[in-house]
A protein has these predicted regions:
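Active-site bordering "gate/hinge" segments
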Residues: 1-278, 286, 295-298, 381, ...
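Dual-mode signal for accessory low-complexity, basic/Gly-rich regions
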Residues: 255-441
Length: 441
């Protein structure tokens, strides 16, 4: 795939005029997908797709972009790309100047190619089926390479490739109630899969017990990493963005100003080095390996795009234009896995949350529903499933004053989204035990 991109780059740059600057961004994947239902393969398939965006600029800071799907035939694709380039060139003079246009002019080429051993999907699926014979399982197994490339007409060339998989699935009991599970990583481990499945089966057995209705109020709860990920995803809607904090639309703007703080055990990084996303942005700037966004409960550094750096006269850290994290890494705590239930003692175990939204964005307050495998805990034991409940609480409470602690063990959660293409977003998170968690309905 890299050689294919290099061939495109070589030919396109032959067509660039002296007063033009061209950036070529390349995205591709070679993926396998297997849909399972009732523990059997129902729909296997594979996807190989290539996309290229051309960004043409001139000395007057005019810029125009075009996004093209390619078919893998170099001759036909080059003809399409050259026609597109000519279209951009023709339209460019009629566009207004872009005062915040900024791209890298210092040549910093990189090549980060996956060196891990590629696993056999058939072997993995055979192993899965050997373990789920008696289970009603529904899910999607996806795996394969994801490629990202960039080249500009100054001679910079960047390449990133990574191999990963995601098995996103649910297991059902006879009453059609489900436990949702996910196993995703860069390397398959039978032991890791067994552990996740065994924990799911144990929860499924408790899910068969009569539903226990709980009343609205404040509870001690445990948020599994997948549930905590929903909270952090909401925090990321402008929370770490320099521009959003500057104009006051960030849900963490009070944290950014120093008017609020989180628990001192909370540290959150953008960890590009250990994630799946590329270490360069679409303008050719190289991202730091790690950006410490929250340190010991205090706001540390925003994600700042090149556009924001020009608009507000500050340094940038090669963030994307959206200034949204793609590889969240939250530091672990001190609660051992076998201590989670005893730490809750009496409360609620929450496996998943969904339908989250802000109830008071200015104060970092959000609301959402419990989902899939949430249980009453009594005397440190899971005793019964609960009715669906709505929570409404502030991040400054959940990860601040009311945070009892984070778990020692963390999980890598790879975004299983595949709209248009497989996602490269990921999060490595602990679980969280929280006191006075507010259930409202």
């Amino acid at each position: 795939m890299k050689e294919y991109f290099q061939s495109i780059v070589k030919e396109l740059f032959k067509n660039i005029q002296s007063d033009e600057f061209l950036i070529i961004n390349f995205d591709a994947e070679e993926s396998s997908f297997v849909r399972l239902n009732k523990g059997k393969i129902r729909q296997p398939g594979s996807v190989k797709q290539i996309s290229v965006s051309l960004s043409l600029s001139n000395r007057e800071k005019r810029n125009l972009k075009s996004y093209i799907r390619l078919n893998g035939s170099l001759k036909r694709d080059l003809a399409t790309l050259i026609r597109t380039l000519n279209y951009l060139r023709r339209e460019l003079p009629d566009l207004p100047k872009d005062p915040y246009l900024l791209f890298s002019t210092s040549i910093k080429s990189t090549d980060v190619s996956s060196t891990q051993q590629v696993f056999d999907d058939r072997e993995n699926l055979d192993y899965i089926f050997s373990k789920i014979k008696s289970l009603d399982l529904v899910g999607i197994y996806s795996s394969g390479y994801i490629y990202t490339g960039l080249a500009n007409s100054l001679g910079q060339f960047n390449w990133h490739s990574d191999y990963s998989f995601s098995f996103d699935y649910s297991i059902y009991n006879e009453s059609n109630n489900a436990i949702k599970l996910n196993y995703s990583s860069k390397n398959w481990s039978n032991d890791d899969f067994d552990l996740i499945l065994e924990q799911g089966i144990k929860k499924l057995s408790i899910l068969s017990k009569p539903l226990q209705t709980i009343q609205k109020g404040e509870y001690t709860v445990y948020l599994e990493p997948s549930a905590l990920n929903e909270i952090l995803d909401m925090m990321s809607w402008g929370g770490f963005s320099y521009k959003a904090n500057k104009i006051g639309t960030s849900p963490l703007h009070l944290l950014n100003k120093g008017e609020k703080s989180l628990h001192q055990s909370v540290s959150i990084d953008e960890n590009i080095k250990d994630g799946l996303s590329a270490n360069f942005n679409s303008d050719g700037f190289i991202k730091p390996e790690t950006i410490n966004m929250i340190s010991n409960g205090k706001f540390s550094e925003s994600l700042t795009s090149p556009r924001s750096s020009l608009e507000y006269s500050v340094d940038h850290n090669a963030s994307s234009t959206s200034e949204y994290p793609s590889s969240i890494d939250m530091s672990p705590g001190k609660i051992a896995e076998h201590e989670i239930l005893s730490t809750i003692n009496n409360g609620i175990y929450i496996s998943n949350l969904w339908y989250l939204n802000f109830s008071d964005r200015n104060n970092g307050r959000m609301t959402g529903l419990t989902r899939f495998g949430c249980f009453v805990v009594e005397a440190g034991e899971l005793v019964a499933p609960i009715n669906t409940m709505r929570f409404d609480d502030s991040v400054y409470s959940m990860l601040g004053d009311n945070l009892i602690g984070l778990t020692e063990k963390r999980e890598l959660l790879i975004d299983s989204g595949s709209y248009e293409e497989r996602s490269t977003s990921s999060a490595r998170l602990p679980g969280a035990v929280i006191n006075n968690f507010k259930m409202t309905l």
